[in-house]
Amino acid sequence: MKFIALKTKDGSSKGNITFFCRVLYVSRQGYYQYLVMKDRPWKYQPLADAMKDILAEDICNDTYGRTRMYQALTMKQPKNVDIPSERTVYRVMEEIGISHHPRRKPNGITKADREARKSEDLLKRDFHAEERLTKCVTDMTEIKGCDGKLYVSAIFDCFDSSVIGLAMDTNMKASLCKETLENAAKAYPNIRGAIIHSDRGIQYTSQLYREAIQKYGIQQSMNSAGGRCHDNARCESMWARMKTELLYDRYDTEKMTTDELKTIIWRYFTSYWNNRRICSTTVSYTHLRAHETELHL
């Protein structure tokens, strides 16, 4: 703006340039460099346009940070766009006002039954999986609606963070966890032998859930003694991302019915999360592309 002050209405320089530069605390070199560069097109404009196109693909994409935006650009390879480093992508995002800063995180809701029999912690915080349907995590979260609370239960595959089982209800009984497991087994019959890790909530230590685990030949894993939240950090992270991307600053959930909440959550997980969303916490974001291809066959 200081450089603009040195120009007349017709755009020509007027007066003693050296004097004006001293008054405005700018250098003559900087001023003349501004004159040379001001009419040149911004070299990152094609990149900025490509990033805006990515955000426009889905309403939830506006939560993309530097990493996922960089990965999206690398996957899509937009025409006539030279993809720079991730750091430069971040600078351009800041410049055009689309950088994302994470906000709130949800708290866990399940309560441990100290008297119930527990299963061993088979994962020991190692959420890395070389193949699909070998390591999974499960948990529940709650969302307040105008007619009560909606409880969402899901099973996530550690390989690519995809949702393989999903169920929702207005109660958080063990039957909800059992339904989630049954939905996963129906959709993925080869889940037999997989490890499914959970916290020590009464739903997961119940006889009903244990019988379902045995029925489908699944290995049950639970948080270590003491119920440390980090033992199931992967699942807690999924809920945090879902609420940040889908709910926070978009919907006033307490003015929505539980049926309305069910609709947007089903759509989010089945249409967006499992098909189009880039998850930077996976082994490699290219695994998500492979999963998309499989789902569309």
Regions found by a protein language model. Give the residues of each.
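A short, amphipathic alpha-helix used for macromolecular contacts
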Residues: 1-12, 41-88
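Major-groove recognition helix of helix-turn-helix-like DNA-binding domains
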Residues: 28-34, 85-94
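Short conserved beta-strand segments at catalytic cores or DNA/RNA-binding microdomains
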Residues: 22-25, 140-173, 182-185
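Short alpha-helical "recognition helix" segments of helix-turn-helix
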Residues: 17-22, 69
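Active-site proximal helix-loop segment of RNase H-like, two-metal nucleases, encompassing DDE(D)
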Residues: 217-221, 234-258, 266-279
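Conserved small/polar residues in nucleotide/adenosyl-binding loops
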Residues: 286-295
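Mobile-element integrase/transposase regions
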Residues: 83, 90-154, 178-180, 187-193
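RNase H-like two-metal-ion nuclease catalytic core shared by retroviral integrases
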Residues: 109-112, 198-200, 206-210, 222-244, ...
